[in-house]
Amino acid sequence: MGGARPDRIRFNVGGQIFETTATTLANAGRNSFFGVIFDDNWDVLYNEGGFSQSQELFIDRNPDCFAVLLNLLRTGDLNIPPNVSEKSLYREASFYGILDHVRAAKWGQFDGNRLRLSRSVSGRAPGDGTAIRAGPDGGCCVAHGSIVHVYDWMLEEHPPLNLDHQRVNDVGFIDADNIVISACERLGTLDGGMGLFSSTTGELRYKFEVSHINSHENKDRDKGAKKGFTAGALCVNPDDYRIFSSCRGRSNEYGIGVWDQVTGKQMDFFYESPGWSLGDADKLQWLGGVYNCLLVATLFPRKDNCYISLLDFRSRDMVWSWSDIGAPLTLTVVDEKRVRDAVAMEEANSICVVNEYEDLGFMDLRMMMGSRSTSIGSIRWSSRSRLMKGVMPDEPCYPKLAVHGGQLFSSMNDCISVFCGSDWVLTSRLKRSYGGSICDFSIGGDRLFALHSEENVFDIWEVTPPPIIL
């Protein structure tokens, strides 16, 4: 071995000898198991690393898995032989700190126009699911009644979550390790509300509490006392570790609560004003960049009217709002223009809404910031989907909207439509024949998850990784 080349490194893994190059190991990245053998210039630290060029590094791990992972680092291709189980391989990849390489080899970068159905998962919970949320690492969680079922990126189920066994209203990932749940209040107790859980063990780490301190709305109440509340729609701001939730308390204790993700302590509470709706919100979305605001949408049929707002917590002001209050209650308006969902598109400086026939409408935020509109005419509606009339299923699901990577997604019945470009042209449809209408969908971790209403099943859509060009 005295004649070994300077860029060669030898390993003894579980009694089996492997030889590779420093270049191959460097592909694992600085934060991997192999990163410690390189200096800042990516030269091998032979002496400082505790080994010499002629010495084998012993690793007491599975050699069959190591061979697969070494080939992955060398070629970018993941080939798993029959004698290696995927679960064992993923466990070894986690040990070496290269799970991200494995995931990248299994499915490609997200693109709505290249998605393919990967698999479907049937749950064991009774009744229909109510919400599905994608995790940042390719896992997901599904809310069924008072239980949340958690799946990792390998789609193996972890211990289920519940918050005092109260009905779950919303759920979301803080990060790959933490999930927040909002639930209904049990009258006469402090049960329900919000809780933060470990996504792997199911442990309740802490409950979020709400109090109303020195507020004009609560000047005659016990200031600072903990209050029971029903938490609704959730939103996370990853930039400053804030969690937002719509809250329904007693009397006029309705609004948007704000908590610190790390400590669980309440930071703020934005009270709804008379004649408006915040505490019953269906959807919250954080807008960063030039807006730095929270979108709050309360929609039909939760309320008789629709309310969409942008809240600036720095100035504690509602800087923009829209409602269909005062719109003519003709059949045309009621049947065709009821807003069922809304999503802000920061890059396009607009808010997109959808009605029950999947007609899309757009409001330009640049022209309307600082104003309040109560005219349904302020929405520029498309009429792309008029053919949907007359073909609605017996129990249709309300359409849902999402924006990801500059693409717009809209679910309708058992199909998800993909729109692209400045004019939001329909470019793709995602559909399968089993499970019934899609009641919810979510995008994250380079995957799209679709939850069906008629069967306890959800689909996983992925992009097939590009071929390795030799």
Residue ranges of predicted features:
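Per-blade loop-tip surfaces of WD-repeat and WD-like beta-propellers in eukaryotic adaptors/scaffolds
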Residues: 150-160, 189-218, 248-278, 287-293, ...
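Residue-level marker for isolated small/hydroxyl-bearing positions within beta-strands
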Residues: 143, 182-183, 246-248, 296-299, ...
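Canonical WD40 repeat/beta-propeller blade segments in eukaryotic WD-repeat proteins
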Residues: 124-133, 165-176, 213-237, 275-293, ...
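Blade-level signature of beta-propeller repeat domains, shared across WD40, Kelch, NHL, RCC1
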Residues: 435-470
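Canonical BTB/POZ domain core
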Residues: 10, 17, 30-99
